UniProtKB/Swiss-Prot annotation:
The keyword Metal-binding does not apply. One of its GO terms (biological process) is defense response. The presence of a 'disulfide through disulfide knot' structurally defines this protein as a knottin. This is a cyclic peptide. Probably participates in a plant defense mechanism. It comes from Viola odorata. Belongs to the cyclotide family. Bracelet subfamily. PROSITE patterns: CYCLOTIDE, CYCLOTIDE_BRACELET. This is Cycloviolacin-O7. The keyword Disulfide bond applies. Keywords: Disulfide bond, Knottin, Plant defense.
């Protein structure tokens, strides 16, 4: 998995989610 540079502790992945990133361990991964 590659970190997308966005956290998802309080809110879900937003901008990076459009690039296919999903929340994993409080960080958005691709």
């Amino acid at each position: 998995s590659i970190p997308c540079g966005e956290s998802c502790v309080w809110i879900p992945c937003t901008i990076t989610a459009l690039a296919g990133c999903k929340c994993k361990s409080k960080v958005c991964y691709n």
